[in-house]
From Swiss-Prot:
It is found in: Plastid, Chloroplast. GO terms for biological process: translation. The gene is rpl14. Keywords: Chloroplast, Plastid, Ribonucleoprotein, Ribosomal protein, RNA-binding, rRNA-binding. This is Large ribosomal subunit protein uL14c. GO terms for molecular function: large ribosomal subunit rRNA binding; structural constituent of ribosome. The lineage of its organism: Eukaryota, Viridiplantae, Chlorophyta, Mamiellophyceae, Mamiellales. The keyword Ribosomal protein applies. Its main location: plastid. One of its GO terms (cellular component) is cytosolic large ribosomal subunit.
Length: 119
């Protein structure tokens, strides 16, 4: 459950480290696979994404439990997102950590192919 003012880790190598959600698109609460508008709160130096930059991101992990249709529930240790461009492609070239299978259903195939593990 991601809402405005929620801090998220960045799960790619785009240069940002922490994001703060400022808007969830088309919903009140964001879940895995939802696109958010966020502001970069921490960033690495000498990288293309700078601190205080407003970016679009897709949620890939949430600490809130997800109940799947087959009865299985899944929960991650942190809230994480991958920064994307207007077309929905990731701005980084690598994705760190596991991601949920729900991204495949939402047509974020490029992120799924970059991920080391899909749960």
């Amino acid at each position: 459950m991601i809402q405005p003012q929620t801090y998220l880790e960045v799960a790619d190598n785009s240069g940002a480290r922490k994001l703060m959600c400022i808007r969830v698109l088309n919903r009140k609460i964001g879940h895995i696979g939802d696109v958010i508008i966020a502001v970069v709160k921490e960033a690495l130096p000498n990288m293309p994404i700078k601190k205080s930059e407003v970016v679009r991101a897709v949620i890939v992990r949430t600490a809130h439990t997800i109940q799947r249709d087959n009865g299985m529930s899944i929960r991650f240790d942190d809230n994480a997102a991958v920064i994307i461009n207007k077309e929905g492609n990731p701005r980084g070239t690598r994705v760190f950590g596991p991601i949920a299978r729900e991204l495949r259903e939402r047509d974020f195939m490029k992120i799924v192919s970059l991920a080391p593990e899909v749960l």
